[in-house]
Amino acid sequence: MDTDTKHKKIKGLFYSALVGDALCLGSHYEYDAQKIYKAYGNKNIERFMGPGEMMGGQTHGIGWGERNYHPGKKAGGTTDYGDYNVLILEHLAKCNQQNEVFTLESLIPHWMDRFENSWGSWICTMTKETYSQLKQNVPLSQVGGFSNAMAIRHLSIYACLSDEETIAHFSREVMFT
């Protein structure tokens, strides 16, 4: 595949993931399929919605109760999962501009700054735990937990790398919470 085609496919992959994430913002953390279907007019999703829109402004996260999990977010915005992908893309761009190699050690200050100053999304239990661990100087090899083991945060790396082992390593690194 030529480089131009590859870059177009990678951009498509990244932006499609963000659009899909934004389409889910309205029902994010709602687990009642009938409630979700009703909120979208008993049909497929046709437009972006704000958090809990058409659901009384709230969704019901298992174990956390009913609330607005993304206060300040608007229709077309991303959930915490989309925000992580944007954060990783920003950090990769910064590494590229400064001619640095991505490391978890270099990501943490960027993540901490965003987390402390402008996150704006739900903060899950393991993210809170990771933040606390970092504040206590727990070694990076020991921070985090298992809640984001299925999170896909590494989409932007495909623009930088092609080696499967390195991509897998990067993917594991960015699942640090």
How should each PLM-predicted stretch be described?
Residues 1-177:
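Structured, active/binding-site neighborhoods that engage oxygen-rich ligands
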